Amino acid sequence: MPRRGVVERRPIPPDARYNSVLVQKFINKVMERGKKSLAERIVYQALDLAAEKLKKPQLEIFEQALRNASPSIEVKPKRVGGATYQVPVEVKSDRRYSLAMRWLIMSARARTGKPMVERLAAELIDAYNNTGTTIKRKEDVHRMAEANRAFAHYGRL
């Protein structure tokens, strides 16, 4: 345990265009090697492209895609007397959105043949429509938790 106590988390300022903290976090996750302006351009253009295809507001698409992609339950390994069990636990809201963002970006990067803007837009549209790689990932996590429901009581120890 640290002696100095817990450090207060710095608040993330909202992004300039939508005044949303979630969009700013997403931009920060898309960013590589400190190139924030490039990450902003990618995210904003992807949201514009998705809005153009779905004929809905950008922020609504983004927030719905995040809600659809975020897991409500996951498994965590817990060691009990020599055996390691995968114990299902509820996911806190911060981690929920963080995982959804991470999965969206990973799925977009895994797609091939198109610029990142188009890949990210396609992944956001898929998540908005409850289809695609990101949603499959979430369902796999839920399936794992369901399969290990018998060990749920270890989470309460």
Swiss-Prot record:
**Cystine residue pairs:** none
The UniProt record lists the keyword Oxidoreductase = no
UniProt GO BP: translation
Q: Tell me if DNA damage is a UniProt keyword of this record.
A: no
Keywords, A to Z? Ribonucleoprotein, Ribosomal protein, RNA-binding, rRNA-binding, tRNA-binding
**What GO annotations for molecular function exist for this entry?**
rRNA binding; structural constituent of ribosome; tRNA binding
Q: What does this protein do?
A: One of the primary rRNA binding proteins, it binds directly to 16S rRNA where it nucleates assembly of the head domain of the 30S subunit. Is located at the subunit interface close to the decoding center, probably blocks exit of the E-site tRNA.
Q: Which family does it belong to?
A: Belongs to the universal ribosomal protein uS7 family.
Descriptive protein name: Small ribosomal subunit protein uS7
